[in-house]
């Protein structure tokens, strides 16, 4: 789409999202894209990726709605609520998402062109050899603490002090999804009476099958 800023990437808890993210990194880094990856090597919910994009772009001339070429965008590797046999790439534009049909249609058309050509022309690198001769610079892969950024910024938009003062007891069920680490961190950061009632990670998404 012509953006030259960093790309923020995250993944959900599906079993194949990790390998899919690695494949995306191989292609992105091979094409000289600076990629912001989760410093904890954990799961990243879409709102955290969106917030990171907005924070970066807000510092540019014209802000989030500007036209600066070095705006950031992002990818969340997730098929959302679909079964574990499915995979997906969700593109987040500089606005933080969701992408409009112009963007998604362009991406789909380009991907199908490569598939029809048996991936001819797709550059890839070896993630274990970054910085070595013939490989991208290791500096293109940048650790980024999505969790800390998101949890700290949450207090800018929610009156969590009032919630804490009211003594509200909160039960949070991540439903096997990417927010599994975030709820506990929110409760700890803001001293809330918050219990994560089901912190298990459902890589097979069996909790969905229970409702089929």
PLM-predicted stretches and their roles:
Residues 67-69, 85-209:
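Gly/Ser/Thr-enriched, mixed-charge loops and adjacent short helices
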């Amino acid at each position: 789409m012509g953006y030259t800023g960093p790309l923020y990437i995250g993944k959900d808890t599906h079993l194949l999202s990790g390998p899919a993210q690695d494949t995306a990194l191989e292609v992105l880094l091979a094409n000289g894209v600076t990629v912001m990856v989760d410093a904890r090597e954990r799961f990243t919910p879409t709102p955290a990726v969106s917030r990171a994009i907005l924070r970066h772009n807000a510092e540019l001339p014209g802000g989030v709605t500007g036209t600066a070429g070095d705006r950031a965008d992002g990818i969340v590797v997730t098929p959302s609520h679909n079964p574990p046999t499915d995979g997906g790439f969700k593109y987040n534009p500089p606005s933080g998402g969701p992408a409009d049909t112009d963007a998604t249609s362009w991406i789909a058309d380009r991907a199908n062109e490569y598939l029809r050509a048996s991936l001819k022309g797709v550059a890839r690198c070896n993630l274990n050899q970054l910085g070595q001769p013939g490989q991208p610079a290791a500096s293109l892969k940048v650790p980024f603490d999505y969790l800390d950024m998101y949890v700290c910024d949450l207090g800018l938009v929610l009156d969590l002090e009032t919630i804490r003062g009211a003594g509200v007891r909160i039960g949070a069920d991540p439903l096997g999804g990417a927010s599994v680490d975030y709820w506990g961190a929110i409760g700890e950061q803001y001293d809330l009476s918050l219990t994560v009632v089901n912190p298990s990670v459902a890589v097979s998404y069996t909790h969905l099958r229970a409702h089929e």
